[in-house]
């Protein structure tokens, strides 16, 4: 692959669902330096816990905005089991195993899961919903004002709590 090839990013359910819920997977697709990769655990979690997002998820897969993989190698299963013993959820275990075993960045918001991932590989690159929104603003995919409206919607309707900043303007450099 050439230097312009996008970087695969293992993406957890919560990060993806944040964009699915507002109908803005186009923001992820517009971040052309990344290719968002989800595990089959994401499909299970979207189907089981976010059924209203299932059609948007399936469209994102068909459109190539996200790519699905199955974690079934011995290395994946070993890391999964080790993390499961720490009482992480199946999804978190899968995302972390996928990122660690493939040397890929991980887009995940869960604080405890992020700590476990970095404990296993301190150089693991972590992304999150807020950082992806900042990159989308910097790429001209939306304005700060539009991002702030989305932030309020997430905080009000979607268990997204990022009170450490009032506006994305504070995060733009």
Q: Which positions does each model-derived feature cover?
A:
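Active-site-proximal, substrate-binding regions of enzyme catalytic domains
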Residues: 2-98, 102-104, 111-116, 120, ...
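Long, charge-dense
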Residues: 125-142
């Amino acid at each position: 692959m050439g230097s312009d090839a996008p970087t695969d990013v293992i993406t957890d359910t919560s990060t993806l669902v944040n964009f699915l819920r507002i109908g803005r997977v186009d923001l992820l697709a517009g971040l052309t330096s990344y290719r968002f990769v989800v595990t089959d655990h994401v499909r299970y979690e979207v189907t089981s816990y976010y059924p209203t997002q299932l059609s948007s998820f399936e469209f994102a897969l068909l459109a190539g905005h996200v790519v699905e993989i199955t974690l079934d190698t011995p290395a994946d299963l070993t890391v999964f089991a080790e993390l499961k013993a720490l009482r992480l959820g199946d999804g978190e275990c899968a995302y972390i195993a996928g990122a660690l075993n493939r040397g890929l960045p991980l887009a995940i918001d869960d604080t405890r899961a992020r700590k476990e991932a970095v404990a296993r590989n301190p150089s693991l690159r972590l992304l999150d919903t807020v950082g992806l929104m900042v990159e989308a603003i910097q790429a001209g995919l939306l304005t700060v004002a539009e991002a702030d409206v989305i932030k309020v919607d997430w905080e009000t309707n979607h268990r997204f709590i990022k009170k450490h900043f009032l506006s994305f303007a504070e995060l733009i450099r």
